[in-house]
Structure formats: C-alpha cells, structure tokens
Amino acid sequence: MKAKERGIETHLVVLTDGSRGGNSSDLVETRNREVKQASGMLGFKSLHCWSEPDRFLDPTEDIIEKASGVIQDLLPSTVFFPGPVEIHPDHRAAALLVWKALQKIRCKEFTPEPISYEIGVQNPANMLIDITTQSRGKDAVMQIYASQNKENNYPELVAALDKGRTFSLPKEVKFAEGFFRYQTKDLGLSFDEMTHLVIDL
C-alpha cells in the first residue's frame, strides 16, 4: 500500500489456483475474482495468475524459467517473495522458485534486489516498516478474501503478526511488517545455504 501511495509501479504473480482452500465447487473462480478485486485496490499495474495446483507447487526447471522470463520482461528493481520459514508448503516453494529464477539472471546486466516478506509467521527480518497508517487499508483488502476468511480468522492473525513486529519500535508505531533484505551477492549461495546463514546470525 505504501508503494501505491508513493506512485511506485508494482506487479503481482499469483502462482497457484487456490483450489484446496475450501470445499466450494466454484472455489477457483471465486478466488480469481477475489485476487483481481484485491489487486485493483492495491494498484498493481499487472496481475499474472499461473494456476499451478494448490499445495503442490513444485519449483521445476520449467516454472523457474517462466519466472525468470517474467522478471526479465518487467525489469523490476526489487523482487519480493515469501520468507523461508513460512508454514504453507506453497509459500516455501515459491521462495525457492524465485531465488532460483533470480540466480538464473544474476550474471546479466541487471539483478533485482531480493526481499522476503512475512505471510503467516515471523521470519528472519532485518528491515521493519511502519504500516500504522496503512493498517486499516490492509485489513480492507484482506476482507475481500471471504472464501478464505470463512475458513479461518486470517485478518486477525495477520494483524497480530503485524502488532508483534512493533516489539522493538517506538510506542507510536502500532503495526509494522518484517522483511529480509538480501544482497545480490547472496544469490551465489543456494537458498538452503543462505537460509542457514541468516538463521545462524
């Protein structure tokens, strides 16, 4: 939301079809509508839905090549991906996939800055961003995902995660998000090696 406020161009790739996030017969179509509505609120310039099978995301060479191609087409200054210790298997697979895609283009003329973000649990973080003024807007976007919110109280859980990130921040900061800002030279390591290095710090 801060990116939208500052006029920064952003793009979103949704990797899986969301088919296992409930029992509704039209769940895939519903989740597609939800993500399109949320993307509109967040101001993404483009939305890419790849429809890989939910909970079975596999970072094969083909999908890594596809991700690498999108990155080279968009030429972003930064690529965001889920943190390495997320609970959902697709989130962890997405992190590995993006890392390998960035490794593929590391020797080319540009390399985006890799930054991981938190979804459901605290991950290694070396950057905290105050989202106090964006928290209501973030909650409004999360409320769009009615198909998922009826399965669990995700907006409350995410708000709790954001509240927890204020532990070391000034008291006027009510909500914050945690990120890990990697250096491009880190791409010389495998994702497993880099994760162990980060956790051992």
Model regions and ranges:
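Hydrophobic/aromatic beta-strand patches that form the interior of the parallel beta-sheet core
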Residues: 11-13, 48-50, 80, 115-117, ...
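Flexible loop residues that form catalytic
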Residues: 18, 52, 84, 119, ...
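Active-site rim/loop-helix segments in enzyme catalytic domains that contact anionic ligands
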Residues: 1-74, 99, 103-109, 140, ...
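Helix-loop-strand module that forms the ligand-binding subsite of alpha/beta enzymes
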Residues: 83-109, 115-123
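Proline-aspartate-enriched helix->loop->beta-strand connector
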Residues: 44, 67-86, 91-94
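Conserved strand-to-helix beginnings and helix N-cap segments that scaffold or border functional pockets
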Residues: 25, 60-64, 91-95, 128, ...
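The feature marks non-catalytic terminal segments
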Residues: 42, 109-201
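Active-site environment of divalent metal-dependent phosphoester hydrolases
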Residues: 19-22, 55, 85-91, 122-124, ...
